[in-house]
Amino acid sequence: MSDENTTHFGFETVNAADKAERVAGVFHSVAAKYDLMNDVMSGGIHRLWKKFTIELSGVRPGDRVLDIAGGTGDLTAKFARLVGDEGQVVLADINDSMLKVGRDKLVDKGFLGNVQYAQADAQFLPFPDNTFDCITIAFGLRNVTDKDMALAAMNRVLKPGGRLLVLEFSKPQNSLLEKAYDLYSFNVLPMMGKLITQDADSYRYLAESIRMHPDQQTLKGMMENAGFAQCRYYNMTGGIVALHKGTKA
């Protein structure tokens, strides 16, 4: 396999063309129990990580927001309240199973007029240039085949001065925490997946994909290379998760 045509699916080296299909299989499998597993895996702490993301977004009434890899709609729901009737939030996800769960959940909660849905690949965003005031991608970038291409696409569809926020698992900043986290990720997570979703393999992939994702400083550099300015990151829970923020010049 040529290095130019390969990428990582967890620890496995695969053809770049095959990764999206394999990631899709993971999320088709876990979509129905995705919210439950998030609560169980993180002890509910993911809600605090997302709350901080919302607070840092600077989203105001009337803004247009794109929630990439928006899945079951946690961030979309909060943004929809912030932008109000004059604003718009687009929940985008490449996976139709996740998108359906998110749409059903938000409709049940009464989010109708200011939320739209798009099945979209982060690398090939189907929106005009300079469309959005803010873009978020939460726990989705590590699953993208070509992260540099996706970051460039996000820069393209942001308005000048618009903000990108990337919430993602990252590298723990303490060696003891890192060892404990690896033990949890590679042993406990797959066991939880098997018990709750009858799917240990998908959560084994989750652990591997986290390990293979760029660390905080590397991702900051990738955002800068994609054209973002004022890039910085905020470590949460000891660096297990990091929130990166950049602005379109």
UniProtKB/Swiss-Prot annotation:
Domain of life: Bacteria
Coiled-coil ranges per UniProt: none
Record key words, sorted: Menaquinone biosynthesis, Methyltransferase, S-adenosyl-L-methionine, Transferase, Ubiquinone biosynthesis
Name the UniProt record assigns to this protein: Ubiquinone/menaquinone biosynthesis C-methyltransferase UbiE
GO molecular function (one): 2-methoxy-6-polyprenyl-1,4-benzoquinol methyltransferase activity
Entry-linked InterPro entries: SAM-dependent_MTases_sf, UbiE/COQ5_MeTrFase, UbiE/COQ5_MeTrFase_CS
Swiss-Prot/TrEMBL catalytic activity: a 2-demethylmenaquinol + S-adenosyl-L-methionine = a menaquinol + S-adenosyl-L-homocysteine + H(+); a 2-methoxy-6-(all-trans-polyprenyl)benzene-1,4-diol + S-adenosyl-L-methionine = a 5-methoxy-2-methyl-3-(all-trans-polyprenyl)benzene-1,4-diol + S-adenosyl-L-homocysteine + H(+)
